Amino acid sequence: MKLFCTQPFWYVKIEPSFFKQEETGMTKAGEREVVKAEHVGGGAGFIMKEALLEAQELGAHCRMFSKVTLPPNCELGHHEHHGETETYYILSGNGMYDDNGKAIPAEAGDVFYCKDGDGHGMKNTGTEDLIFIALILKM
């Protein structure tokens, strides 16, 4: 699969070997473990993290692929990524994304990308759970 950009002279080519080379499987909703973690990155309250795939299923280039739930007034504190990137895809709820100290409103459908060497965080500023997919890729 090749992804081309309108910018000249570059493209991103994702080789099948980027992903796990073994036979793929699946995980069923309700059968995955959900872990509660308090004060992540020094943030207020707690998060609920559901690994959508386990470490042995992620391959060499992916460190985490999880669904994260932030209850109202809870946050995933500011943290930095070194040697990896992290992407958030907001599924539902409202919050405030911390992009290297700059607050950006977050809502369903938004995608946030934290590049290698940068820092970020997320706070639920709404009245319902803020739910997003988090993907960490190793450089």
Positions of PLM-derived features:
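Conserved short histidine dyad/triad with adjacent acidic residue
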Residues: 53-54, 66-81, 116
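A short, N-terminal "cap"/entry segment at the start of jelly-roll beta-barrel domains
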Residues: 3-62, 77
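Short, surface-exposed secondary-structure edge patches
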Residues: 67, 87, 101-105
